[in-house]
Amino acid sequence: MQSESSSIKVYFADEFKRNLRALSKKYRHIRSDIQPIVEQLQAGELPGNRIPGINDIVFKVRVKNTDIKKGKSAGYRLIYYVQMPTAIFLMSIYAKSEQVDISAEQILQIISQLNDAIIPEEIQDREGSDRPEG
C-alpha cells in the first residue's frame, strides 16, 4: 500500500507571501527557520495546535526565530490550513514581537480568499477523478 503522505502538496497563500516578504527584510533567516515546518507538513505531520472556534482545520505553529536568539515563544507564528488531506496552505506568518495574535475573523477572511481563488490543477484533477470513465 502506498503512503498517502508522499503526495501532500504545500501551497503558499498570497497573504503568507506578503508576510514572509515583509519579515524577511528584518529577519534574514526566516526562510530557513520555516523550512523544517514545511518538511513536516509534506511528511504528513500536523505540528502545532488547532485553532479553536473555526470549523475548518487550521493550526498555529510556534517557529523559532534564529535571528533574535530566543526560543519558540518569542519567535514566529505560522498559520496553516488543511484544505484536504493532500493540500495544505500556509496562510499567514507573523513575529510574536510585532503582533500578539491573529483573530478568527482574519483567518476566515484568508480562507475565503483562498476558496475564491483558482483551485490548483492538482486539486481539480483529484476532485474530478471520482467521475466514472466511459
Predicted regions and their residues:
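Alpha-helix C-capping/helix-to-loop hinge sites
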Residues: 19-26, 44, 94-97
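Arg/Lys-rich, positively charged N-terminal/basic patches that mediate binding to nucleic acids
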Residues: 1-36, 122-134
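A short, surface-exposed loop/turn module that caps and links secondary-structure elements
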Residues: 42-69
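Enriched for short, Lys/Arg-rich terminal
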Residues: 2-4, 69, 74-134
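Short glycine-/polar-rich loops that comprise or flank the Walker A/P-loop
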Residues: 8, 56-57, 84-87
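Short, charge- and proline-biased low-complexity linear segments
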Residues: 31-42, 93, 98
